């Protein structure tokens, strides 16, 4: 539930490497 400061509209979350995932076009962690 914490925004990772990255969007995932056109590309996947690079922050997935630290546990972020794409939700509602924004990368979130927990």
UniProtKB/Swiss-Prot annotation:
Tagged with keyword Plastid: no
Cyclopeptide (Gly-Asn) cross-link, renumbered residues: 1-30
Keyword Disulfide bond: yes
UniProt keyword list: Disulfide bond, Knottin, Oxidation, Plant defense, Secreted
Pfam families (UniProt xref): Cyclotide
Disulfide pattern: 4-20, 8-22, 13-27
PTM entry text: This is a cyclic peptide.
Cellular component annotations (GO), alphabetically ordered: extracellular region
InterPro entries, A to Z: Cyclotide, Cyclotide_bracelet_CS, Cyclotide_sf
Family that this chain belongs to: Belongs to the cyclotide family. Bracelet subfamily.
Designated name of the protein: Cyclotide cter-P
Organism in which the protein naturally occurs: Clitoria ternatea
